[in-house]
């Protein structure tokens, strides 16, 4: 299952120095981002997803254009995806941390249930965003992301998953469990029933001891035994959901990196327009222009830095024009600074 906003080439520089040298990211991070930026080598690694073919560059330029022209939706997606990714990672860490420890089964079940529930609810919210904005998610370059998302998690399946996770721990109150369904790869709770533990306890305890008090004690013991059995069954089922959670953790990490990048592009696009910069996203392959910059590639690692004059036969680009001493270079430096900040903390003030 592959879900992403744009393609990324599996490529990395042989030396970190080459990556730093390309656009002087180390200098930007050290001098402009301050203490908030954190581990500079880690940031450089996050920023490193270069494109090497014309089709990849063209595809991503279309996605960047869609992100800039629909910035409010881009920001909503960023907030939802980043939050979902962070919560899922924390939940998986909590699940792993609970294994091998002498914790109550109810506690371990609660950790599993909450992690699964938050993931499914978050995926459902993303699906609803697409349904409410079909003109963006189906008619712009965002469809590359949304089509693959819907293929992996159809709306009908999400409804079933949502109904299941909302009632997954309902047994806590009355001693009853009914779980059934086959829902998604790695998330199958199929034909499983542990029903009416309380009734079984009452029937089993009615003839064990004479007297009212004895029956209550017996019923309670059998009831607790039934609940413990039910907890073990549910915990084993929830453990089977781990592949589902791990798969989405990997997907959401990729989506988070990409949507933060797109949100940074949209933010700088808005900022540029507000101060009077003119943006052009050329389509004619034979065009050439001076002072050619592409918003999507401005902070990416290429074998050679983007020159001042670029032939559009080889790559799409964005033109930034303005009067002499009009702030073009300052804007481009701000773009680099903002991208470093956006990749690390999700926001930037320029």
For every predicted segment, state its role.
Residues 1-9, 13-14, 23, 258-326, ...:
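Conserved NTPase motor "head" modules and their coupling/switch loops across ABC/AAA+ ATPases, GTPases
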Residues 93-100, 233-243:
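Short, charged/polar, low-complexity loop and linker segments
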């Amino acid at each position: 299952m592959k879900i992403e906003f744009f393609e990324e080439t599996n490529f990395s520089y042989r030396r970190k120095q080459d990556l730093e040298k390309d656009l002087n990211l180390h200098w930007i991070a050290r001098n402009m981002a301050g203490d908030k930026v954190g581990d500079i080598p880690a940031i450089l690694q996050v920023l490193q997803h270069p494109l090497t073919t014309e089709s990849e560059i063209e595809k991503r330029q279309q996605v960047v254009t869609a992100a800039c022209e629909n910035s409010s939706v881009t920001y909503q997606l960023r907030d939802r995806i980043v939050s979902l990714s962070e919560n899922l990672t924390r939940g998986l860490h909590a699940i792993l941390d609970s294994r091998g420890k002498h914790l109550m089964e109810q506690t371990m079940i609660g950790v599993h249930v909450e992690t699964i529930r938050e993931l499914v609810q978050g995926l459902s919210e993303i699906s609803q965003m697409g349904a409410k904005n079909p003109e963006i998610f189906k008619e712009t370059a965002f469809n590359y992301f949304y089509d693959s998302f819907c293929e992996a998690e159809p709306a009908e399946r999400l409804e079933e998953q949502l109904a299941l996770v909302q009632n997954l721990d309902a047994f806590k109150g009355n001693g009853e469990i009914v779980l059934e369904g086959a829902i998604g790869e790695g998330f199958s709770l199929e034909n499983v029933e542990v029903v009416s533990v309380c009734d079984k306890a009452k029937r089993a305890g009615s003839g064990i001891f004479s007297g009212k008090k004895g029956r209550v004690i017996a019923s309670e013991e059998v009831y607790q035994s039934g609940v413990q059995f039910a907890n073990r069954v549910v915990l084993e089922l929830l453990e089977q959901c781990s592949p589902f959670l791990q798969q989405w953790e990997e997907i959401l990490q990729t989506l988070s990196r990409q949507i933060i990048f797109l949100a940074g592009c949209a933010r700088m696009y808005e900022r540029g327009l507000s101060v009077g910069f003119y943006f052009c996203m050329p389509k004619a392959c034979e065009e050439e222009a001076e002072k050619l910059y592409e918003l999507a590639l401005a902070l990416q690692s290429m074998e050679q830095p983007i020159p001042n004059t670029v032939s559009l036969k080889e790559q799409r680009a964005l033109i930034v024009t303005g009067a002499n001493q009009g702030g073009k270079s300052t804007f481009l430096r701000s773009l680099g600074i903002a991208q470093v900040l956006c990749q690390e903390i999700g926001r930037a003030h320029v």
